[in-house]
C-alpha cells in the first residue's frame, strides 16, 4: 500500500479532532506535515510530523500529495486554489467556499490539474444521520411529505475565536452549522425548487448570525432546517413524516466526544450510540402498525478518508465531491438573499 503523505494547514480544533487522528491511525495515510506559525502542538502529539512555519513551505514540498484546508472559512478559496496549482490533491473543510463562483473556479482548476478536490462534510458519517438515511432509503415512512432538521446549541457567550465572531465572508451559524444540515437534506431529497430563509442575530453581543430557519421547497414536500444558539433544552435533531409514518431521532455527537477524550478511532464501540439515543419509528407495513425504537447505525468518520484514498489511488469517486460542496454554498447564498429581501428565491 502506497501511503498518501498528507499535510494539515491548521492544528486547531478541526485539525486536532477531525483530521489528525484519522490520517495518523489509517495505514493508507501518513500524517506528514502541518502548518503552525509558532506553536508545535501537532509535533507534541505526533512526533514524526514535520512542522512548517509558512504555507509556501507546504506547497514547495513535492512529497506532499494531499493538503487539508482546515483554516478559517474566508481562506478556503485562496488556500485550495494555491494547493491545486502546486499539484496537490485537496480536501477543504466545510463550508467549501463563501461564494458559488469561487467553488466553480476551483472545480474547473481541479479538473484541469486532474486532482481530487473534496469537501469534508463529516456529518454524513454520523450515527444519527446514517440512521435517518437508512429509514428513508428503505421507505419505512412511505413518501416523505415533511422533514425538519435541527442543529441547535446553547452558547450565550461570544466565542474567543475572532474569525468566527467578526462579520465577514463565511462567518455565522448558517455557514458553520447550516452547511452540515443543508448537505444532509440535499443528499436525502435532492435539489429543491426554491428556498426561503429567516437569518438573524439573537444574542445581545453577537455580530454574526446565530439563528436561522431555512425552508426548502420541493414539489410535494417541505424541508425545514433550523439552528439557534439559544436552545438550552434540545429538540429532536430529525423529525420526518411520510404517507405511512413518522421517525423522530435525537441529534448525537458520539464520535466528536470520543475524539475530544483522546480515544483512538477504531477502538471497540467506536461510533456506537448509547441505547438511550434510539430513534422512534411509528409506521405501518403490510397492514400492521409498528411503533418501536430503532437502534442507530454506527458512525464512522474514518470511512470518509478510506474513500478519499480510493479516489486518489484507484480513481474512484470522492466520498463528497466538490460539486456537492458547491451545491451547499448555492443554497446558503440563496438563503441570505431570501432573508435580506424577505421573499422566496427560485433556484
What are these regions (language model features)?
Residues 1-3, 66-68, 115, 293-295, ...:
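C-terminal helix-rich "cap/oligomerization" subdomain common to oxidoreductases
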Residues 1-46:
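N-terminal Rossmann-like dinucleotide-binding module
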Residues 33, 65-66, 146, 222:
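Short, Asp-centered acidic motifs that coordinate Mg2+ and/or phosphate
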Residues 50-54:
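Short acidic-hydrophobic, aromatic-tinged amphipathic segments that line or gate anion-handling sites
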Residues 66, 72-73, 77-124:
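Beta-strand-loop-alpha-helix segment that lines the small-molecule cofactor/substrate pocket
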Residues 123-205, 342:
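Predominantly a Rossmann-like dinucleotide-binding segment in NAD(P)-dependent oxidoreductases
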Residues 183-267, 302-316:
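Contiguous beta-strand/loop segments that form the cofactor/metal-binding neighborhood of enzyme cores
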Amino acid at each position: 500500500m502506497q501511503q498518501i503523505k498528507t499535510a494539515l494547514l491548521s492544528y486547531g480544533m478541526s485539525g486536532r479532532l477531525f483530521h489528525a487522528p484519522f490520517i495518523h491511525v489509517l495505514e493508507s495515510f501518513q500524517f506528514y506535515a502541518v502548518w503552525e506559525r509558532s506553536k508545535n502542538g501537532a509535533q507534541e502529539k505526533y512526533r514524526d510530523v514535520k512542522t512548517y512555519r509558512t504555507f509556501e513551505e507546504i506547497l514547495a514540498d513535492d512529497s506532499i500529495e494531499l493538503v487539508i484546508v482546515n483554516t478559517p472559512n474566508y481562506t478556503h478559496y485562496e488556500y485550495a486554489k494555491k494547493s491545486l496549482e502546486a499539484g496537490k490533491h485537496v480536501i477543504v473543510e466545510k463550508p467549501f467556499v463563501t461564494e458559488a463562483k469561487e467553488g466553480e473556479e476551483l472545480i474547473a482548476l481541479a479538473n484541469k490539474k486532474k486532482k481530487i478536490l473534496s469537501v469534508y462534510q463529516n456529518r454524513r458519517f454520523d450515527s444519527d444521520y446514517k440512521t435517518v438515511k437508512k429509514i428513508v432509503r428503505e421507505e419505512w415512512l412511505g413518501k416523505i411529505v415533511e422533514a425538519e432538521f435541527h442543529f441547535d446549541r446553547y452558547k450565550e457567550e461570544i466565542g474567543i475565536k475572532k474569525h468566527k465572531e467578526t462579520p465577514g465572508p463565511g462567518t455565522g451559524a448558517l455557514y458553520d452549522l447550516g452547511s452540515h444540515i443543508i448537505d444532509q437534506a440535499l443528499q436525502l431529497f435532492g435539489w429543491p425548487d426554491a428556498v426561503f430563509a429567516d437569518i438573524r442575530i439573537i444574542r445581545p453581543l453577537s455580530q454574526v448570525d446565530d439563528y436561522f430557519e431555512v425552508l426548502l421547497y420541493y414539489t410535494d414536500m417541505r424541508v425545514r432546517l433550523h439552528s439557534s444558539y439559544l436552545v438550552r433544552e434540545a429538540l429532536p435533531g430529525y423529525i420526518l413524516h411520510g404517507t405511512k409514518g413518522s421517525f423522530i431521532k435525537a441529534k448525537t455527537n458520539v464520535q466528536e466526544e470520543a475524539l475530544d477524550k483522546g480515544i483512538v478511532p477504531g477502538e471497540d464501540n467506536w461510533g456506537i450510540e448509547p441505547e438511550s439515543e434510539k430513534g422512534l419509528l411509528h409506521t405501518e407495513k403490510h397492514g400492521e402498525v409498528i411503533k418501536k425504537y430503532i437502534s442507530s447505525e454506527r458512525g464512522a468518520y474514518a470511512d470518509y478518508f478510506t474513500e478519499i484514498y480510493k479516489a486518489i489511488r484507484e480513481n474512484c469517486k470522492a466520498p463528497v465531491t466538490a460539486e456537492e460542496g458547491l451545491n451547499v454554498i448555492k443554497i446558503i447564498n440563496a438563503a441570505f438573499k431570501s432573508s435580506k429581501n424577505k421573499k422566496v428565491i427560485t433556484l
